[in-house]
Design a protein with these regions (language model features):
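Short, low-complexity, Pro/Ser/Thr/Gly-rich segments in the mature regions of secreted, periplasmic
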Residues: 114-124
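Glycine-centered beta-turn/loop sites at beta-strand termini
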Residues: 37, 46-48, 56, 65, ...
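N-terminal segments that cap or nucleate solenoid repeat domains
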Residues: 25-68
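Sequence contexts marking disulfide-bonded cysteines in secreted/extracellular proteins
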Residues: 29-36, 107-109, 118-120
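Acidic glycine-/aspartate-rich tracts in secreted/extracellular proteins
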Residues: 94, 113-114
Length: 124
């Protein structure tokens, strides 16, 4: 019986060690800046009350304006896609944001006054 328990605990420990470095894709509201995604396909939301620096990292990511907004916030957000086909949206009505597409085919949705770099497609 003790041998079975020891074998079971060893197997569990090996599985935990093997799965520990695996990062899962996330969907999250960024509550601090800078805010980082993972190397998977993430969805990140900016915070409406302060200047955001959001880094999507690898994967086909989406960066969007905040989940809620009472009125346009005069903040300057920096949104950075990473390697992958990212969708960066800064249509938060302030026109002061900077979007960097990164490697891959990136789509940037902006307001008048926002700036882009490395976006293969730019729209409003």
């Amino acid at each position: 019986m003790k041998n079975r328990i020891l074998v079971l605990l060893t197997v569990v420990a090996l599985v935990v060690v093997m799965l520990a470095p695996v990062a899962l894709a996330i969907t999250k509201q960024c509550w601090a800046s800078p805010c980082y995604g993972t190397n998977k396909d993430d969805t990140l939301y900016e915070h409406p009350r302060f200047n955001n620096k959001i880094y999507a990292l690898r994967g086909d990511d989406i960066i969007r304006p905040a989940l809620w907004r009472i009125r346009p916030a005069p903040d300057t957000d920096i949104l950075r896609g990473g390697p992958g086909n990212d969708r960066l949206k800064s249509d938060d009505l302030d026109g002061r944001d900077v979007l960097y597409g990164g490697r891959g085919r990136d789509v940037c949705i902006i307001n008048r006054g926002d700036r882009t770099r490395g976006c293969e497609k730019v729209g409003r």
